[in-house]
Amino acid sequence: MKKDIIILGIESSCDDTSAAVVRNETMLSNVIAGQAVHKAYGGVVPELASRAHQQNIVPVVSEAIKRAGIRKEEIDAIAFTRGPGLLGSLLVGTSFAKGLSLSLGIPMLEVNHLHAHVLANFLREPGEESQHPSFPFLCLLVSGGNSQIILVRSPYDMEVIGQTIDDAAGEAFDKCAKVMGLGYPGGPIVNKLASEGNPDAFRFARPHVSGYDYSFSGLKTSFLYTLRDKLAEDPDFIEKNKADLCASLQHTVIDILMKKLRQAAKDHSIKQVALAGGVSANTGLRDAFHDHARRYGWTVFIPKFAYTTDNAAMVAISGYYKYLQGDFCPIDAVPFSRITV
């Protein structure tokens, strides 16, 4: 096998069109085109998302290849997100990958979006030394659609040992932010306001779920009932207390996440712990990871902010590991909206 492997990654699972190029584990480019159109609707509109992907995919891929400083003929394989995600959005990336694969005569690599988030911890930028978790390690994957504790034995062997049984942590942030009138996406807004508030100002329900599983529906309901009762007494309650509400909400979510992760790490005698997914951009959660590193002797790994949300660099490095295994996919591969780790 040649020494350097160049992989083009394509990500189109939701509302971000992204393309990236990696040489082995080193990122050469990572281009992302977002879709501001969804803010007016308070959430992602699937039809609008797929149309925007069709408009963005060609210029985004072209720009990624240009920034990487390579010719398209140097690409060894194309990695694309097969799922989970919005089917219409996934179809755009999958179809483009097929066309480019046929035109260049190179293989395709189908990537699980959740695997890719985990493997974002293995990305490095030019000039950086490789610093990534040793196997086995635990990864807390938190996003708008997923809250999972994953036991990672290798890039090809991952097991979900705990997951949400209802709402995801990111979904709880978004929905609670929406009822406060804070806008979409709610997670970053809650994070910003939380830094200005008192995390002990309000107490919300904490679930009692067996094992390492999570539940956030009770917390969400408790939050809504608190607002209902307080607004009945004072119509300006949210405006007067939004920083404290956000701080208390964020503190509760993080406490729920970390309690289960602590138990999983203890039970599996693991000290290598990673964070991944869109909610990993939350500064409070990052601080909690560093605090646990000091208190419990963990070695923690947290992706740079650029690799926390959906991006093609994580797809490309996931594809790189598949390339090493010779795990190529047929040209008739189809995307799936729902697949697990």
Swiss-Prot record:
Q: Which InterPro entries match?
A: ATPase_NBD (IPR043129), Gcp-like_dom (IPR000905), KAE1/TsaD (IPR017861), Peptidase_M22_CS (IPR017860), TsaD (IPR022450)
Keyword list (alphabetical) reads: Acyltransferase, Cytoplasm, Iron, Metal-binding, Transferase, tRNA processing
Per its record, what are the GO molecular function terms? Answer: iron ion binding; N(6)-L-threonylcarbamoyladenine synthase activity
Sequence positions that bind Fe cation: H113, H117, D310
Q: Which domain of life is it from?
A: Bacteria
Protein localization: Cytoplasm
| Major place of residence | cytoplasm
List, alphabetically, the GO terms of the cellular component aspect. Answer: cytoplasm
Outline what the protein does: Required for the formation of a threonylcarbamoyl group on adenosine at position 37 (t(6)A37) in tRNAs that read codons beginning with adenine. Is involved in the transfer of the threonylcarbamoyl moiety of threonylcarbamoyl-AMP (TC-AMP) to the N6 group of A37, together with TsaE and TsaB. TsaD likely plays a direct catalytic role in this reaction.
- Under what name is this protein listed? tRNA N6-adenosine threonylcarbamoyltransferase
- Source organism of this protein record: Porphyromonas gingivalis (strain ATCC BAA-308 / W83)
- Which gene is annotated as encoding this protein in its UniProt record? tsaD
